[in-house]
């Protein structure tokens, strides 16, 4: 009888262990973001590039994303090395690429990639890209996959209201840039949500405008945030 109880107990442990192991087969549990780094410092040029690589997920979207980021890094390095003659010891040409994972409550993996290049002149150029990934199946998401046809008018109206209020109050912290500083917009600035970089941060969807899109370089890159509860009726997918 004792042997039978021991045997049944062993079977139960095996079953529980197997159940736990099977739970790890989901893409979400197995996913792991690793850093891929490229770095070199020479007299006339330097680059410091760090890109994310999503491991443990096998689907076309993630494979495409990983390879695309590698290709972007390769092209950036080639361009910097190719323009090395424009650099000097005092002011070498340079390239930097980094990324940030935005923690949020939308069940979306938001990766924001920032690229900076300097190839001579008064200042360098900073650009930002985002990659939004559904954590349920690890498919890449874009604006039209997430929001319905009425969302565009809503977002543009709200952003234009902020732009107008900011202009009338000479900034007055109505709109801020990525550094948390006030934005002074162009006189003819008009919002277009389709021209923004979109990512998810906390309880907000964030729309970021690149340099010169609606504000001068000195004002940085304006950001507009919309709370999850305010945009719920425009969302097509379940978070």
What are these regions (language model features)?
Residues 1-8:
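Bacterial N-terminal signal peptides that target proteins for export
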Residues 21-239:
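Compositionally biased intrinsically disordered regions enriched in Thr/Gly
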Residues 10-14:
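Alpha-helical transmembrane segments
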Residues 16-19:
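C-terminal motif of bacterial Sec signal peptides marking the signal peptidase cleavage site
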